Design a protein with these regions (language model features):
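Short amphipathic alpha-helix that is part of the acyltransferase structural core
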Residues: 1-32, 123, 135-150
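A conserved beta-strand-loop-helix scaffold within acyl/acetyltransferase catalytic domains
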Residues: 29, 33-73
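A generic "binding-loop/recognition-motif" signal
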Residues: 65, 107-108
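Conserved acetyl-CoA pyrophosphate-binding loop and the N-cap/start of the following alpha-helix
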Residues: 78-87
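Conserved GNAT acetyl-CoA-binding A-motif
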Residues: 93-106
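Conserved catalytic-core motifs of GNAT/GCN5-like acyltransferases
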Residues: 101-103, 113, 118-138
Length: 150
């Protein structure tokens, strides 16, 4: 492997990024949506083997005391080689004074525990499609409320 880390969006093939997310079993959108999300993020990390994108991640942050980490993905054929560790460490180094909330895929908790991430007792999320997130294991339960309950 010839691993290279990039921290800007200038060389990203957004269709390839979409494919990496899909192959890693993550949520994915049109390439233009990912481009906008990464370009507007505080921190981003892209991992290449030679010129092939194999892993990625990003954080949104105020850069002072709060951050949220999203889209940590490594191609399955590269998992277990420390690529995810490189991504997480680079992101955490970019937000050294910040508390960070992580949006992780179900079943990946043990990996993130190695970096001192812990489950929150008070964390909550609003999803555009709560039923889908329930089916994918992201939330424990959901109750459909109409707009009058807000």
């Amino acid at each position: 492997m010839n691993i290279r880390v990039e921290k800007d969006c200038s060389n990203v093939d957004w269709n390839r990024l979409r494919a990496v997310l899909k192959e890693a079993g993550m949520g994915y959108h049109d390439a233009d949506i990912h481009k906008k999300a990464f370009e507007n993020s505080y921190s981003k990390v892209f991992i290449y083997d030679d010129n092939e994108l194999i892993g990625l991640g990003r954080a949104i942050s105020d850069g002072v005391y709060q951050a949220a980490i999203y889209d940590i993905a490594v191609l399955p054929s590269y998992q277990g080689y420390g690529i995810g560790k490189i991504i997480i460490n680079n992101i955490l180094e970019s937000i050294p004074q910040c508390n960070a909330i992580l949006y992780a895929s179900p079943g990946k908790e043990d990996f993130y525990n190695k970096f001192n991430f812990r489950k929150m007792k008070t964390g909550m999320a609003y999803f555009q499609n709560a039923e889908k997130m329930y089916e994918r294991g992201f939330i424990e339960k959901f109750i459909v409320l109409n707009n009058e309950n807000r």
